[in-house]
Amino acid sequence: MNSAASTHLLQLPQAPCPKPAKTAQPVKASPLLKVAPVPAPLAAKAAKEKKRKKTIETIIRRFTTYATINSQSWDAYDPTEFPISDGQEDMAELIEQELRTIGSDKDLIVSRSEYQYVYATIPANCEGVPSIMFMAHMDCTPECAGGEITPIVHRNYDGGDIQLPAGITLSPETPQGKHLANCVGKTIITSDGYTLLGADDKTGCTILVTLIETILNDKKLKHGDLHFVFSQNEDIGRAADRFEEEYLDGQPDIVIDVDGDDPTAFSVENFTAVGRNYIFHGKNAHPGNGFYNQYGDALTAASYFIGQLPPETHPSASKGKEGYIHCYSVSPLVDVDADDTQQEYLVKVRLRYFDPLEGKAFRQLLDRAAELTAEAFPYVVTEAEPEVMQYENVAYTMYPGLDDLIVEAAEKEGVKLTPRSERGGTTAAMLAAKGQKGGPCLYSGQQAEHSVYEWTCAEDMYQMVMVARSIIETVANQ
């Protein structure tokens, strides 16, 4: 091809060469995110709180089950009798069965006596540690309406008045509800207002059964022999009447009752309590011929006897460590409508005092009242029955230094407790009157006891379980 015949070809621009593909690099796996471990103190705190809540729920279930049983005690005139109601027996059977479920025969020895006392012992797991006996009572007072008891659980209490189905109000502004101000956000348990609740002393029973369960699940806790007594007829002053020491293998070193009503204090001394009965034997006659027929008006004579006692010795005039004389019952011993001739009236009298000299003065006043009555009513025979020691001051026989030990143990649980004098009696005080060792009384959670306003706080009961556990630990470490 010669150059003359050649044609010019259109030169198209060339597309840029594609960049060579980069060699694929292996993708590195992202390291797994490491979750920081929960600090040990926080984990322990969370576990402790979970356990606390679980125990409180157990306490609520346990107490409300106990409360539905009407275990009111009832008194008998004959001091040799020891009446037990069906409800008291049901209560004893329930606690016995529950304890046998909680522990084995090896680590918890359980017995129920023919008088419906329940005894339990956790054997010592170390040597040289004082033994402790904790006590509560299963019966409730006959001095308030009982029958069908309906406990009501009020969760997350808001601090206001609690309206009960019976139409009554439990208020923090009243004496019965003053402790409610300290229970905001907690669980309150009341009755329906028609009956008592039985917090005195089923709260104590709840605390002790829960304490037993707590101890058996805590293998690190060192302790001496631990005894638990669930008694009967405390509310009629006879809890010691059928107490059987042989169930405990001798006297314990330390005695502690769980039957108090003050969350800030525990009793270290109490009244000496004496019961006296006076019988006025008279005879009926037509009042129109009363002089000639030697009318023996036993009822008026009994009233006259009561009237001879100075008003300043009445309970309404007594406070602090002052004692009192209380003529609390006047009742016929015969059917006055069925018997045309005989009249007999019984006057029951309580003597309460801290000072033995005051007790002696009270006895002299009663003796003088009986003498004056015999002079004023010559046709009525005034008979003074032998007095009965109902309970004794626990301060006389309490374990030395126990008050300081309890204060120390409570402080470890963040609870401030103050020793106080008790204007009443406890199971420990009744045992002291029978020659047993006396001991203090701890708060059990009961409030407004012996009334239809009676109530308790579940968290209070839990707190006292932990205080009791701390007492056991402190005793072992002293």
Task: Identify the role of each PLM range.
Residues 80-83, 325-335, 347-354, 381-403, ...:
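A short beta-alpha structural unit
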Residues 128-221, 225, 230, 463:
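Active-site metal-coordination/substrate-binding segment of hydrolases
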Residues 268, 290-336, 340, 357-383:
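Acidic-enriched catalytic cores of C-N bond-cleaving enzymes acting on peptides and small amides
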Residues 343, 416-470, 475:
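Zn-dependent metallopeptidase/amidohydrolase metal-coordination segment
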